[in-house]
Amino acid sequence: MNNFSIISEYKPAGDQPKAIDEIIAGLNSKKRSQMLLGITGSGKTFTMANIIARMNRPTLIMAHNKTLAAQIYSEMKLMFPKNAIEYFVSYYDYYQPEAYIARTDTFIEKDSSINEQIDLMRHSATRSLLERRDVIVVSSVSCIYGLGSPNLYYQMTVNLESGKSYPRDKLLSDLVNLQYERNDIGFERGCFRVKGDNIDIFPSHYSDKAWRLSFVGNELEYIHEFDPLTGTKLAKLDKAMVFGNSHFVIPQETVNKAISEIEVELQKRLELLKSQNKILETQRLNQRTQYDLEMLTTTGSCKGIENYSRFLTGRNAGEPPPTLFEYLPKDALLFVDESHVSVPQIRAMYNGDRARKKVLVEHGFRLPSALDNRPLKFEEWEKFRPQTIFVSATPGPFELEETGGLVVELIIRPTGLLDPECIIKPATNQVEDLISEIQTTIAKGLRVLVTTLTKKMAEDLTTYLQELKYKSSYLHSNVHTLERLEILRDLRQGTINILVGINLLREGLDIPECGLVAILDADKEGFLRSEVSLIQTIGRAARNSEGRVILYADKITKSIDKAVSETMRRRQIQQEYNEKHGIIPQTINRTIYALTALKKIDSKLDKKQAHILFDNPAKLKAHIYKLKKAMLKAASNLEFEQATKLRDQLKNLEEAALELS
């Protein structure tokens, strides 16, 4: 069994050693829930990595969005280069679920675009969980959505071993049942080809490796791993395990049984609709379902097959669907990062999904069993989750209730940096005072972050600052992905000194050069000025030893009082620790994770073309397809050097697309 081996130039410092020991003690004493309260810059990810390495148990880390998940995945890959670090998020670049708007009698067909790179990584994640124990899967909250049954997925694997006998026709039939496609011309992921006594398989979990099976009669003589682009042999294998090309691979006998059960439900539903005199709904449901049944009978699949998942996975009505949690070993660990956001997301997903599907069922577009194709209910997630560590700088009520209000704190930063000084000033003439504070901060060579309440305020303030000849820019949801990253890069490099935004809590805004965070209209209670939001925003100034925060308010709200009091409490603890140990706070110049994506974008793309591609998923997909086609053409012409260059460009573009998704 492989053990986790953490590789880092740093050792746990500050509060980290104590926090690691406390969490591990809790895990060993069978505590089901623990709370790790880690402030900005305290090294939460490094602490998680050390806990995982010492416990040596398979781990799932849940994040509340793809960007944060990609950041954690990247950091874990660096710290655990010898272990299986996997990424599991929704594989849709674009997803429009089917829906019916009764008021206008409008039916919206399901439409989606699948990201092949993410699909590959999802397959790699489930394969690792089934094959080994030194696995860390970093996932978004989408891991609570239905996935194929792990029992069927594992049951249908094809195990290959050198020296054993495999009847050729049966092996090819097994590959087709795993939803691999025979393609003797275009050899891509999820395909196989036959050449003489050789069968080449391009596994679903690889992008740059394939397997060549060399037979003598029915005996498998060799298994070689090779580069599918150049044909170069990479390794000789004794064994290989071929997993399905889809997580929804199903044995034919299961499909046949499901068809019978669907027919029974259909007849019951049609009788009910007829009794309610719903003629249109009756005809619609019968026509749509009969078509799906015909497709299932002839091909083993149909469009929207997931709506019949209850029958295909052998579940009873109302039972939870199989999800990634069923792929986890019983002794797995779960970290819920930024739990104050992630937990409410988990709670909300089921209700939103059910409301949409209920309308489809009522109007004859789907059978009632389609309601069981859903994410986990919060109560089900509670039941399935293994020993859990919630991680946040601002724990939510659920986490505090689960842990009895007991938290393990990460307050002392390894760098010695203090929480910023908080100053409260009147909101009257706040812009005039802000200009004065900006001048003082910029004179020190530092940057300024300003948070407003609306997009218009952010844009108007930026325009005003630019009229005063300040190098400033604004950031909000209407700013496209690449432009956003370029603004952050310009801020880091000093091309601009001031960034104005609405919600400065998003990943990527930990700016070490930030000397001032100004919160305008801090006394306007609401989502953007709640205690949690204020603490998180104040944390933006905690990366610099000279960081300050000014809250412009005409009255002290409960949120301001609690946020400032908590910040001052932490600051005092940090000061006392530094004085006791003779530590001088030091600003750490850390690379912003999201900016590394800019370096991976094809250098041949000019700025305008890059913006067009990354702001339009369809055009980006078309460009990636064009590069793939050129790469394969170069390989078929034996121009392997050119093919390799194109493959590197393609890889950089796909990685950048993944990080910017």
UniProtKB/Swiss-Prot annotation:
UVR domain sequence ranges: 621-656
Record-annotated Helicase ATP-binding domain positions: 25-182
Subcellular compartments: Cytoplasm
Keywords: ATP-binding, Cytoplasm, DNA damage, DNA excision, DNA repair, Excision nuclease, Helicase, Hydrolase, Nucleotide-binding, SOS response
One of the GO biological process terms: nucleotide-excision repair
Gene Ontology molecular function terms on file: ATP binding; ATP hydrolysis activity; DNA binding; excinuclease ABC activity; helicase activity
Disulfide bonds: none
Coarse class of the protein's main subcellular location: cytoplasm
Matches recorded under Pfam families: Helicase_C, ResIII, UVR, UvrB, UvrB_inter
Source organism, top-level taxon: Bacteria
GO CC term (a single one): excinuclease repair complex
Domain Helicase C-terminal, first and last residues per copy: 430-592
Binding site for ATP: G38, I39, T40, G41, S42, G43, K44, T45
Motif extent (Beta-hairpin): 91-114
NCBIfam families per the UniProt record, alphabetical: PRK05298.1, uvrb
UniProt comment concerning the protein's domains: The beta-hairpin motif is involved in DNA binding.
Self-association state and partner proteins as the record states: Forms a heterotetramer with UvrA during the search for lesions. Interacts with UvrC in an incision complex.
Function: The UvrABC repair system catalyzes the recognition and processing of DNA lesions. A damage recognition complex composed of 2 UvrA and 2 UvrB subunits scans DNA for abnormalities. Upon binding of the UvrA(2)B(2) complex to a putative damaged site, the DNA wraps around one UvrB monomer. DNA wrap is dependent on ATP binding by UvrB and probably causes local melting of the DNA helix, facilitating insertion of UvrB beta-hairpin between the DNA strands. Then UvrB probes one DNA strand for the presence of a lesion.
Sequence similarity: Belongs to the UvrB family.
Name of the featured protein: UvrABC system protein B
